[in-house]
A protein has these predicted regions:
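Charged, amphipathic alpha-helical regulatory modules used
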Residues: 1-111
Length: 111
């Protein structure tokens, strides 16, 4: 994936898995890098913020780790979340990584 970099844009490395959400068939970004970076930071922050809540639900013993992730995904796919379906899937995948929980790799998600 070709991503032009300038001085300020090198501060935060965006994972290729997130860049792929915004890449066209020729592996070029469909949005300006600044927009993609902002969306990445939002999704990463959400995943980080959800770790405590997800861990608490899981440790309560009433729901499985997978159910917790499914609930998070459903919430983030809600139109009020401000995320696209693909971003929601990425954020939950990242949440699972942060918690060390298994989660299937997300496929292409319709918006």
């Amino acid at each position: 994936l070709f991503v032009p970099m300038d001085g300020e844009d090198q501060q935060t490395e965006i994972p290729s898995s997130f860049l792929a959400l915004y890449a066209d068939a020729r592996q070029r970004l469909r949005e300006p890098l600044a927009v993609v970076r902002q969306r990445y930071e939002l999704c990463e922050d959400l995943a980080q913020l959800l770790t405590g809540q997800a861990l608490g639900l899981s440790q309560s013993g009433t729901v499985s780790d997978q159910e917790v992730l499914q609930r998070c995904l459903a919430g983030l796919r809600n139109a009020d979340s401000g995320l696209s379906a693909a971003e929601a899937g990425w954020a939950v995948q990242r949440l699972a990584e942060l918690l060390g929980w298994g989660w299937p790799e997300p496929g292409p998600q319709p918006d």
